[in-house]
């Protein structure tokens, strides 16, 4: 029987597609190998994006099926996975991947659109969070806190 925690881990690994994992990095560790690197740390929104930024990410793609109105230290593109969420929280969204499920775009078309958005963001286009002035951090507290 699968636990909720193991389901979360499986979903995270599946986001890497068929690419082999080349390295597992410590929290905020810098990648030294080309390819899919996994970063140790919690998977919640603000802590994980803070860790990715500390690890050297310049642009973060954050997929969500619920939506969280936060902004990370690095430009963070919120990729929404369903149309319902986009309808209710459009000002939090950067990219609607739900168009694949609704048939409005093919997977290849949506992938091209997202790739173009990443290039635009890396070139200075503001994300939804940046336009709203959101730039939060959350440091992972591993161990005893006094």
Residue ranges of model-derived segments:
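A structural signal for small-residue-enriched, beta-sheet-centric alpha/beta enzyme cores
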Residues: 3, 90-96
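Short, Lys/Arg-enriched charge-dense amphipathic segments
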Residues: 12, 85-92, 132-135
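Hydrophobic alpha-helical bundle architecture
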Residues: 26-87, 99-103
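A general structural motif
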Residues: 13-20, 39-45
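Extended hydrophobic packing segments that form well-structured cores
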Residues: 56-58, 63, 74, 97, ...
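Single conserved hydrophobic/aromatic residue that forms the stacking wall/gate
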Residues: 1-5, 9
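A charged nuclease-like catalytic/ligand-binding cleft shared by nucleic-acid processing domains
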Residues: 16-25, 135
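Generic recognition of cysteine residues
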Residues: 8-9, 40, 57, 86, ...
């Amino acid at each position: 029987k699968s636990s909720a925690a193991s389901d979360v881990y499986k979903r995270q690994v599946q986001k890497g597609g068929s690419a082999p994992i080349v390295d597992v990095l410590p929290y905020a560790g810098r990648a030294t190998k080309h390819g899919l690197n996994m970063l140790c740390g919690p998977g919640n929104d603000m802590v994980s994006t803070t860790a990715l930024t500390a690890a050297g990410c310049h642009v973060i793609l954050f997929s969500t099926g619920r939506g969280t109105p936060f902004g990370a230290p690095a430009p963070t593109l919120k990729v929404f996975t369903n149309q319902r969420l986009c309808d209710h929280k459009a000002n939090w969204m950067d990219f609607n991947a739900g168009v694949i499920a609704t048939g409005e775009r093919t997977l290849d078309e949506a992938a091209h659109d997202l790739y173009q958005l990443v290039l635009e963001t890396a070139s200075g286009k503001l994300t939804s969070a940046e336009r709203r002035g959101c730039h939060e951090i959350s440091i992972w507290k591993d161990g005893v806190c006094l």
